[in-house]
């Protein structure tokens, strides 16, 4: 991000494991294949590997090789506090995509910050950014200087609600997730890769969402479009939503369709979305 080029300079060269990772290790919640996302210099992975775990480092600056598999446990220690909101959103999406369906991620954030925004780094003498962070995930641990959130895929958490989008099936394949929005593949796809972007809070249609929810949906639409392009290599897309029964809406919980299109999937694609009314596409 152009506005935050020095976030990597906030990584500390430590001689021991970080407090959140040691806490989680002592609590026995670190399982299976582990990823330290935003690992800095890699001290936590060094500690966990010495304890018999298989822990991979990923850091855009210090360990830039992006992981090519999914993980049982993902750690993200003090990363979000030094990122701009749009960078935070990207991290949340990437971690959701790297986590196995039954896995858990732990986001540690600082609770002792006194100053917010840009400041001059006391060692490197360049502007670095910091902010307070609150997530709508389970608060797993908290003290005066640290809070650890536990994240699981939205599709894997039974929240007691009845709606198919408020409490989606654990069999639904998650594509990506943000704090307020998630994406899954459509159960009855129009084409290969047909995906849905769904706000977690139930609203009847797009125009009842808050501005923040609309922004989150737009971020997710762009992310899912990129994922589908890489995975299915379509020739085009139809993206949109139905509002009210007259427009074909059957589930009254806002959801945005992302429908990949392929050359030859219909005889004459001219007019695209105009074809919701037969005969109106060819004009």
Q: Where do the model's predicted regions map?
A:
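A short His-aromatic
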Residues: 81-83
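A conserved beta-strand element that flanks and buttresses the S-adenosyl-L-methionine
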Residues: 75
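Cell-envelope and extracellular/periplasmic
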Residues: 78
